[in-house]
Amino acid sequence: DLKAGGKNKKTKRTSPKSNDIYLKLLVKLYRFLVRRTDSNFNAVILKRLFMSKVNRPPLSLSRLIKYMQGKEGKIGVVVGAVTDDIRVYDVPTIKVTALKFTETARARIQKAGGECLTFDQLALRLPLTDTVLLRGPKNAREAVKHFGPAPGVPHSHTKPYVRSKGRKFEKARGRRKSRGFRV
């Protein structure tokens, strides 16, 4: 745009910030795939491998099952962690690729006859299979509840930063009719 004098001021990561050697190997592999194949899928995965942890939210088993419904035979791909969800009673047979699985999530998927793949295993099967790209909910973090219009302004449901949740900490004035007013 003109303000920046024709320069693009947006920054894009070109490599992961982390020093994790296994992540760097994956990046090396997917850089190769992006260069040698004209697959958009590989490019998206490479871009997501660079992302910060906040932008790689975990996906719970229950959401994974919901998103994979009717897509049997395809491989779910999550650039992030897959976590267990005890609210799910029976797990269907699913194939999933993720950066990380929690122990219980991995055990339950495998017990149901599913597969937990890594990204290098996925790269070997890529041309042969259909994939479903998934991500976790980014705004489900605790920190996000504190964002928005200041707590205390009308119709704001923003969570205040309180040192303790006791009776006398931001619970009375402005919170209930009997104590002055209620927003």
UniProtKB/Swiss-Prot annotation:
Organism: Cicer arietinum
Disulphide bridges, residue numbers: none
Keyword terms: Ribonucleoprotein, Ribosomal protein
GO BP: translation
Full protein name: Large ribosomal subunit protein eL18
Pfam family, one: Ribosomal_L18
InterPro entries registered for this protein in UniProt: Ribosomal_eL18 (IPR000039), Ribosomal_eL18/eL18-A/B/_CS (IPR021132), Ribosomal_uL15/eL18 (IPR021131), Ribosomal_uL15/eL18_sf (IPR036227)
Compositionally biased intervals (Basic residues): 156-166, 173-183
SUPFAM superfamilies: Ribosomal proteins L15p and L18e
Region (Disordered): 146-183
Superkingdom of source: Eukaryota
GO cellular component, one term: cytosolic large ribosomal subunit
Family as reported in the entry's similarity comment: Belongs to the eukaryotic ribosomal protein eL18 family.
Molecular function GO labels: mRNA binding; structural constituent of ribosome
